[in-house]
Amino acid sequence: MMVAWWSLFLYGLQVAAPALAATPADWRSQSIYFLLTDRFARTDGSTTATCNTADQKYCGGTWQGIIDKLDYIQGMGFTAIWITPVTAQLPQTTAYGDAYHGYWQQDIYSLNENYGTADDLKALSSALHERGMYLMVDVVANHMGYDGAGSSVDYSVFKPFSSQDYFHPFCFIQNYEDQTQVEDCWLGDNTVSLPDLDTTKDVVKNEWYDWVGSLVSNYSIDGLRIDTVKHVQKDFWPGYNKAAGVYCIGEVLDGDPAYTCPYQNVMDGVLNYPIYYPLLNAFKSTSGSMDDLYNMINTVKSDCPDSTLLGTFVENHDNPRFASYTNDIALAKNVAAFIILNDGIPIIYAGQEQHYAGGNDPANREATWLSGYPTDSELYKLIASRNAIRNYAISKDTGFVTYKNWPIYKDDTTIPMRKGTDGSQIVTILSNKGASGDSYTLSLSGAGYTAGQQLTEVIGCTTVTVGSDGNVPVPMAGGLPRVLYPTEKLAGSKICSSS
């Protein structure tokens, strides 16, 4: 029986269970699988249970369901999962559906019983740690959730913030260019309002700091993803990050690095929205431009305090899935290769590996179980092999994760990138020619390899030899990405081995 080489490699790459209080340095080498708890896996293991995204109702995903599908996640080489918020939500079915997503909390000291019990959440943490994997939990400090108009909120339903005194006065954000409005006014609308906590008040601040430390400790959490970071004043975040005692990565939904990067001065990392937009635009069609992506890689590298602690992604529950723009599988493979081999921490959204194509929320919140969890789909296999070479490079090169990705050059359809110290570098060649792209040989200069050196292309498991002039002859075909690594460094790795 033939077994995929990345399965053999990943099976052998078991690490010690992580200690608590995982540091930013610990997280640099992780690869994250992001999932909505309600939409990933059910306790009963069903792959047919109905989940109509348009209904916006609970579909039955649980923490126990996740535990039962960790083989599926780890089989792609992921070393961490990020789950949606765990706190108790507003109980009503609103005009916008249920709070299945977890961002309409009402009681921060109780868990969302739809997902399971406290013991179930602890069991998920333990199950991950037994595999040497990390648990990241989504948290919300900016707001609570209310079924009704912002002008008529019953504040007594919120725990522990049970009076209006804990909140900013009611006003909806009208102008996102006004940072005071962004921080002090409310998200939501008069159907579901999101009362905005006044985090400038010591009583609110101290409550959150105590709560987040307890949450991390009680459930052995290794990292936090923080929602709506730009809607809270910056001086709140250093104390929150410190109280958590683990790596914190914030959502700052803005593509301008001049706006987004400074938030890394107040917490460990942020989601890399500055890269998201040019990455999407470069690959969502065969006419996309590489110029903006090339320039933004360099801008983020120079302007953000530490680009190696950012989260790289192209899909999540807030933005349309990549396949909603194009069904070209070659373009999807290039985007996935970029995410995993760029600077920072790769983040793949559940369903991306099955080429899910949901558009705007709620269509992009499909149930993963309806795919049947196949492990032989093209993107599942590509993600597994890309994570495998990244994990291997990290194990062999202590400087890999801190070496900042260098785009070697760009043209209308191609961008090659280099990451890793001399002699151990990975060179990734990305193309947006698409599945109908022609076959040709790219003569690549500037990759840093030596004349006569043999390289393995670890997607197709072929080899090339560096020319006497130092150029690498890279066979390109079908618009597929290429990933090069020194052949001699692969000895004993099982990478590109079928035995």
From Swiss-Prot:
It comes from the Eukaryota. Its cofactor is Ca(2+). It is an enzyme of class 3 (hydrolase). Residues 1-21 form the signal peptide. Its EC number is 3.2.1.1. Substrate binds at Q56, W104, H143, R225, K230, H231, G255, D318, R365. Ca(2+) 1 binds at N142, E183, D196, H231. The active site is at D227 (nucleophile), E251 (proton donor). Belongs to the glycosyl hydrolase 13 family. PANTHER family: ALPHA-AMYLASE 1, ALPHA-AMYLASE FAMILY MEMBER. This is Alpha-amylase B.
